[in-house]
Amino acid sequence: MNDKISKLESSILQLTEEVKQLESKQASKELEIRTLVDNAINSQNPAQERELINKLFTESLIDLKLKAEKIQTLERYRQEIITNLLVEQKQPNDTSIISAWEQLKISSFRINPNNNNNNSNNTNSSDSNQNYSSVILNGSLTEDSTSTISPDSTKNRDEEEIIRWEIDRNEISYNREAKLGSGAFGSVYKGIVRGKEVAIKKLTQTVFEENTMNEFKKEVSLMAKLRNPHLLLFMGACTAPEDLSIVTELMPKGSVHSLLRAKEDTSDFITFKRAILIARDTVLGMTWLHASNILHLDLKPANLLVDQNWVVKVADFGLSKYMKPDSKDKLLGQAGSPLYMAPEMLVNQPYDGKVDVFSFSILLWELLTKQEPYNKLYSSYPQLVEGVVNKKNRPIIPDYFPTRLKDLLARCWDHYPSRRPSFAEISKQRILETILIDGLILDSSARQFWSQYYMGKEEVPWNSFIVNFSLYCGFESNLSADDIKIKFLKLLLVPVDSDMVTIDNFGKILTWVGPLTNGREFFDKVYSICSIKGFMAATSSKNASQYLAGKKTGTYILRFSSDPGSYAISYLNKNKEIIHARVIYKQGSGYIHHGGQTHYATLDDLIKNTFKSLGIKEPFEGGPFHALTVAASSSKPFNIAGAYIPVAPSKKI
């Protein structure tokens, strides 16, 4: 080609690179705006964020105008090249002209910005698959090298599927006052469709561009294909342009994000056990999603919803993308919420499903610590990139986390995607189930027992438990259900209104009556503690005070302290005041009063040797352990229900 064409091609290269830089700049601004919006929503004084948001929008408008001007210039250059090519054409079948035109089509849309060779026939093949188109979706910008909708061959089927799930706008009834949540896309309301209570995700825009409609249909098509107990159930959609809505099952407890704010003394508080179970359900949902060749790309507590039984489901697939089965190619672009983004996503590098694994690690840390990721360390998007990508900073892992949990977090948020485990690996290796056992059962032998017989179970029937536990302890047929030691153990482990042994109660009880090093010694210890006069096990200080009210001076109760492994003696002193004295057990030394100097081999010995100094006289007579002891000594039948003393409920032990 002549020099003029070469110069034009060089100008196209430069302008294309400038357009790409503007798009990247826009992406960063869009993500920074989203971060500021999140901060403003949670801030009591959002004025500062509002000012910064307005500034960023102004800068974005300037960049968009500049980008439009550059694209117009590009079009003029293309027109000039085509005109020159046609002028240069000497023969109808000139192959050099055909080759140049084909190359021009590639360079116009899929160009290698680092290629300084002006020979238009020399294009880097690795860049021939890049498509630098941008789409704003739900307030996040995405740049794709792979279509965010299903392949062309399935478009018709997708359209048919959308029609099949169509819900007429007149069938949708919702109350604007019953808002469940909101975001850049619009709002979610509680409503009724065909007589069923549902959640309705309603887009609040009134004018929709073609891209918005395509992305909406993509989300509908994707959700219609997903059926798993840990993925939010899609029930239909309204595709009327003026009333775009997605209908899903209603999740009564709302999002994990909102539940993270629950107070410790409420029923919705996320304990260690609940946090790990939420993580397990998330992994199960994400394993299914990735096996379906779909990446979520916005995994965070706000997109995990909880039903009335604490079953967790992954939700909000507005940013999700298909990935070709068995493809080694990676995707390009940025999507999601910055605080949960993987390093490669933050700097717009190629990525795969491991970005979801990184997001999972951040939300798992948040579940367990109840703190915002990075603890507000970064106030802007550039600061976040500098800290997470360049300095490789991660949230601080508390020392008290079980070793396996620390290891899982470190692996999942590894800087290098190839080192992160897949969701399938986490699920198959039962990593979270093992972490649950590690965190709830401190006794190593007891951990081994639960892992051997009940891996993956949070509660088991008493009849199954006692058979396997007896075998594990070395007893085959020597223990009878009528044995008082077995009955004492059941009183410790099984609530009066249940017949189930839970993993957390089993672990907690072992801190008081363990260790489980020798089966016979363990059952002997259970008997020696439970048969002590005045023993009331897991009675709270509040309930102990109620039991002792109106009793004689010196009446006492022996109970488990709220501090696992410690005991408390609650008694009525001579001034009719309720005193709670803590007793600490030290392995190998015995029992000692808090602040005392003498250790005793048994609790009974401690009480017998210190009753005068404490001013205790008579044990409280009542409760199931006292009733069982009396029944055993008199050969009378034991009525467990009648042995319980009704008191006002108390949450603390």
From Swiss-Prot:
Keywords of this entry: ATP-binding, Kinase, Membrane, Nucleotide-binding, Serine/threonine-protein kinase, Transferase, Tyrosine-protein kinase
Segments crossing the lipid bilayer: none
One GO CC term, this protein: membrane
Catalytic activity from the UniProt record: L-seryl-[protein] + ATP = O-phospho-L-seryl-[protein] + ADP + H(+); L-threonyl-[protein] + ATP = O-phospho-L-threonyl-[protein] + ADP + H(+)
One record GO biological process: signal transduction
UniProt key word Membrane: yes
Function: Required for proper chemotaxis and phagocytosis; proper spatiotemporal control of F-actin levels in chemotaxing cells. Negative regulator of the PI3K (phosphatidylinositol 3 kinase) pathway. Predominantly phosphorylates serines and threonines and tyrosines at a lower level.
Protein name: Dual specificity protein kinase shkB
Lineage: Eukaryota, Amoebozoa, Evosea, Eumycetozoa, Dictyostelia
Annotated gene: shkB
